[in-house]
Design a protein with these regions (language model features):
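Contiguous, well-folded functional domains in the mature portion of proteins
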Residues: 1-202
Length: 202
């Protein structure tokens, strides 16, 4: 199983500190450091998956639990997903297409279940376009997740399921999609990045 590169430094520091503390005989603190190193390995895991294939599908951009499925007045739909600290935290593109824009927006760090979190919290906004429309993936920071990392830039050409970024320590991902799709998930569903079908074109 691979590890997301953003976890390397944390894992190394915890292991190195633990070994140093063992050398000097500080076993209780060393055990805590080793436990944290193992937790970071688990948290930043990048498991091998088989990407769901098919025409006209929108895949889940993240692992987690669906918080809300909502149709907006302009015909767009939005699906909001909560990521706990136990979920895989890397994000994948829900569709094939071209990255049109990547925007960082500073903000607050409210907990993901706060109804205002998706509006006021710090976030990265990744806009992807293909022949079926425009799709927006929002990586949203939270009360613990204080850093959202995007791995893509405008002009990048993506295939559905490609990795696009990571959020550190639990938060929320929102996906906005154009009209013309049948939603295949509901509130409370557990979803898997690149595997679960969010919606299919009508």
């Amino acid at each position: 199983m691979a590890i997301v590169k953003e976890g390397y430094s944390l894992i190394f520091v915890m292991f190195a500190t633990g070994l140093l503390l063992i050398f000097f005989g500080f076993w209780p603190i060393a055990v805590i450091c080793m436990f944290l190193a193992l937790f970071f390995i688990y948290f930043f895991r990048d498991p091998n998956i088989t990407i769901t294939q098919g025409e006209g599908l929108i895949l889940s951009p993240c692992n987690g639990t669906v918080l809300e499925v909502k149709e907006k007045s302009d015909g767009q739909s939005v699906i909001r997903v909560f990521l706990s600290v136990f979920d895989v935290h890397l994000q994948r593109t829900p569709v094939s297409g071209t990255v049109k824009k990547v925007e960082y927006r500073p903000g607050k760090f409210l907990k993901a279940h706060d109804p205002q979190a998706h509006i006021v919290n710090e976030k990265n906004i990744i806009t992807i376009e293909n022949e079926n429309g425009v799709y927006v993936v929002e990586q949203i920071a939270g009360i613990l997740a204080r850093r959202c990392v995007s791995w893509v830039k405008p002009g990048d050409i993506l295939k559905a399921g490609d990795k696009i970024g990571v959020i550190k320590f639990g938060s929320q991902v929102d996906l906005y999609m154009p009209e013309g799709y049948k939603i295949d998930v509901k509130k409370g569903d557990t979803v898997v990045s690149g595997v679960t079908v969010f919606a299919s074109i009508r």
